[in-house]
Amino acid sequence: MAGQPTISRFFKKAVKSELTHKQEQEVAVGNGAGSESICLDTDEEDNLSSVASTTVTNDSFPLKGSVSSKNSKNSEKTSGTSTTFNDIDFAKKLDRIMKRRSDENVEAEDDEEEGEEDFVKKKARKSPTAKLTPLDKQVKDLKMHHRDKVLVIRVGYKYKCFAEDAVTVSRILHIKLVPGKLTIDESNPQDCNHRQFAYCSFPDVRLNVHLERLVHHNLKVAVVEQAETSAIKKHDPGASKSSVFERKISNVFTKATFGVNSTFVLRGKRILGDTNSIWALSRDVHQGKVAKYSLISVNLNNGEVVYDEFEEPNLADEKLQIRIKYLQPIEVLVNTDDLPLHVAKFFKDISCPLIHKQEYDLEDHVVQAIKVMNEKIQLSPSLIRLVSKLYSHMVEYNNEQVMLIPSIYSPFASKIHMLLDPNSLQSLDIFTHDGGKGSLFWLLDHTRTSFGLRMLREWILKPLVDVHQIEERLDAIECITSEINNSIFFESLNQMLNHTPDLLRTLNRIMYGTTSRKEVYFYLKQITSFVDHFKMHQSYLSEHFKSSDGRIGKQSPLLFRLFSELNELLSTTQLPHFLTMINVSAVMEKNSDKQVMDFFNLNNYDCSEGIIKIQRESESVRSQLKEELAEIRKYLKRPYLNFRDEVDYLIEVKNSQIKDLPDDWIKVNNTKMVSRFTTPRTQKLTQKLEYYKDLLIRESELQYKEFLNKITAEYTELRKITLNLAQYDCILSLAATSCNVNYVRPTFVNGQQAIIAKNARNPIIESLDVHYVPNDIMMSPENGKINIITGPNMGGKSSYIRQVALLTIMAQIGSFVPAEEIRLSIFENVLTRIGAHDDIINGDSTFKVEMLDILHILKNCNKRSLLLLDEVGRGTGTHDGIAISYALIKYFSELSDCPLILFTTHFPMLGEIKSPLIRNYHMDYVEEQKTGEDWMSVIFLYKLKKGLTYNSYGMNVAKLARLDKDIINRAFSISEELRKESINEDALKLFSSLKRILKSDNITATDKLAKLLSLDIH
């Protein structure tokens, strides 16, 4: 072989201008057999900044990727091993080139190059003022059309960001920023000092990790992929002839769309954007007093669209905040200047960006589709405008189909649901710590599926106010509890649910076209398993479900409807047939190309003609390679010779035998013992085979999209299947909770509001393995609608009133509750004022926050409300606190339709208000005098008893907090002095009143006696 130097492909571009004519004949590895289909642009090679990091070997082992022509074999006779750098002049030239290019301060990235140089001519070194390279020009064109996005562009086996995008991404990801032009339009004054754009890069295998980090910073990120391969570009007459590969945006991600549009395996159970929604919101103010809102909210993971129109006083915005809490917006589309600053601040506080988007003209067929959809749900014109706006916004993410399905639209507010306001959700620990331990959600959640968990969350957020629906859930719980141990059908179904993936999310991803093949396979497999399960138990279903006289039909109309509909839908779906079209072994294939090409079982797939045609062409090329191998065997006289692999189709020859090989054989690489070659014919055939492989991948991708469309055609039916399974999962979850010890079915009563319970317990505290003392609840017109509860600090007052509210909410969700017996009315809302905290962000003090909560309660309560008022007035002075509390109780006690109220206080004088609606209670305790303590210690009994208590026993709490005993004794003595002063002051006031009445001369003795009797004497 020739004595020319063998060099790595990393150096080829750096030295080619200095090489001799013989050296210039060297062929790039990317042009040889087995070159990868993803390549770098040639002009990207021109942008290399340094070759100093590249290793040049001078021993007998060749550099990876080196190739040499067989034409130089005569000069290699003295060397039976690989070639070496034995040319001193060449080394000097190489050193000069390395130094010169190092001075240009441009980063070396040639390790990504794979052969795009086939399509561009060699260019001379450029000055900083030279024109942009074709790749940079392509990047600029893309960015100028997508200024609102961060572009992450594939270049070889890396993804790169350029100019201002690179600055942003490098800062967030903490990766190196290579110097260059900092703005895409070259507006930065320093840009003239550079000839390429600044950039940062990361390996393609890290794309999913970095994407999630970028969108978490509220960035809109577009992933730009190569739209053609080197093989197609070379052999396809219809391919573009430009010097760079065509690149297109393949996906656009935001925080709202990443979870549902990502094709990656997402980490953990929490999926970004799982419960979040995208809003389109408009706000109009009438006469400066009333603000009217129109809202469309879409959750892409659940495939739910919520619509709402509501009014509230300008600057109030309480209803808006409730919707923000429930729907958790992550993006909000608004018209320019549509929202005032105080409303925009609500969204800023939750890191929700406002996107100013004007209305766009939609295509005629889209307008018609929206019109047809609206015929079924009857939205107002303002809501239809928002639907159109959201549709045009979704087009960018390929999620617009969700806006055209009428069955997924639902109103936010409903007459059959109660809405818990944010205060109640927080103070009652409904979702404390995201539903973690110690919350009501944690207590009730025994769901087996992700979609069941999300539905249970909706049930808890919106308890029922329709007693018929509540009773149906309670009947279902009783039925499933008795049936589950006697039915193989239910037992097996419950086991299947334990291993069921998120069917609803996968179904929506199938509709969006973003799901992976493995995900589709497991989705079809799971639905098919449900189909088989129902087929297997048809006799049981016929006996108990298909007739309303069956056991299930009699016990639970809700379960009867659920399973009757499930049985019908599962018996008609085509998904089991679609499952037979999949090649299971290909689904499990780790090689992504093989997974794509072999995904379909062509014996069952009904659109396989295009794939089969390309496969036949590929087989023809492989046959020709076999023929070529037979010729090579004859020439080398090695009848058992085989290609080294069926990718590169290389011929392996011992180094001692290479001198007799044909001149046109091309050496690809070598070891100390053997060299590997490709012949001109095998090279052409492998390139042709690569071309057909790329065609097959392209055709398989097209067929995969058609396959997803076939599944999507059953979207409405499949969604019903999933929602019915979710509802059953929720019933199972509530049944599991209801099986706890001493849980009882609530009884609902008509007439005036009442809660009557015997030995009721706080469900959350009890579930934390704390021994909880049960208490009775007596609230009704006869037993008092207003309960004023006094007692020592830490005596259990707040726990008791929370207990009443939690039992009410659990009962109206449709769950059994912890009590021996409970009878209650239906409540339309539960309003709370519990705890003390300020709002530093809004500049509100503790007392102002307290008063704002009271105002909210006064505006929203009615006769069917349950109010929890915990120590109102504690945020201000004692006299003001007493006055406000007194005024509140008097106000409610004089209402003709007074709601049920639980009022805890440390102001015992409030219990002296006279009203037939008021009952006084206190949390019981036992006093104990201990040695060395001036104050009375208290043993809490946590039992509710009638009557008032006049001491809060704050010293006892100070002791529990382990304050120094001397400090507590001093505090007690001061407290006693103040108490005596207060008693003396009251006595003086009484004496003064007596004196004034007795000295009055202008009234009769009878009137004097009446006034004396009216004095408040204790």
Curated annotation (Swiss-Prot):
**Effect on the protein of changing Q4A:** Partially functional in a mismatch repair assay
Q: Where is this region: Disordered?
A: 21-82, 102-127
Q: Where is the composition biased (Acidic residues)?
A: 105-117
Output the Gene Ontology terms for molecular function: ATP binding; ATP-dependent DNA damage sensor activity; DNA insertion or deletion binding; double-strand/single-strand DNA junction binding; double-stranded DNA binding
One Pfam family name from the record?
A: MutS_II
Primary site of residence: nucleus
User: Where in this protein would one find the motif PIP box, according to its record?
Assistant: 4-11
The record lists ATP as bound by: G791, P792, N793, M794, G795, G796, K797, S798
Annotated GO biological processes are:
DNA recombination; meiotic mismatch repair; mismatch repair; mitotic recombination; removal of nonhomologous ends; replication fork arrest
Q: Which UniProt keywords apply?
A: ATP-binding, DNA damage, DNA repair, DNA-binding, Nucleotide-binding, Nucleus
Compositionally biased spans, kind Polar residues: 48-60
Q: Does the keyword Transferase apply?
A: no
Q: Highest taxon of the source?
A: Eukaryota
Q: In UniProt terms, what is the effect of altering K158A?
A: Alters DNA-binding activity and impairs MSH2-MSH3-mediated DNA mismatch repair
Q: Where is the composition biased (Low complexity)?
A: 64-82
Region listing for Mispair-binding domain, in residue ranges:
126-256
Query: Coiled-coil region(s) at which residues?
Result: none
Q: Where does the UniProt annotation locate this protein?
A: Nucleus
Does the keyword DNA repair feature in the UniProt annotation? yes
Role, per record: Component of the post-replicative DNA mismatch repair system (MMR). Heterodimerizes with MSH2 to form MutS beta, which binds to DNA mismatches thereby initiating DNA repair. MSH3 provides substrate-binding and substrate specificity to the complex. When bound, the MutS beta heterodimer bends the DNA helix and shields approximately 20 base pairs. Acts mainly to repair insertion-deletion loops (IDLs) from 2 to 13 nucleotides in size, but can also repair base-base and single insertion-deletion mismatches that occur during replication.
- What family name appears in the similarity comment? Belongs to the DNA mismatch repair MutS family. MSH3 subfamily.
Q: What is known of its domains?
A: The PIP box serves as a PCNA(POL30)-recognition and -binding motif.
Assembly with partners or alone: Heterodimer consisting of MSH2-MSH3 (MutS beta). Forms a ternary complex with either MutL alpha (MLH1-PMS1) or MutL beta (MLH1-MLH3). MutS beta interacts with proliferating cell nuclear antigen (PCNA/POL30). Interacts with SAW1.
Another remark in the UniProt entry says: Present with 736 molecules/cell in log phase SD medium.
PANTHER family in alphabetical order: DNA MISMATCH REPAIR PROTEIN MSH3 (PTHR11361:SF122), DNA MISMATCH REPAIR PROTEIN MUTS FAMILY MEMBER (PTHR11361)
The protein depicted here goes by the name DNA mismatch repair protein MSH3
Lineage, highest ranks first: Eukaryota, Fungi, Dikarya, Ascomycota, Saccharomycotina
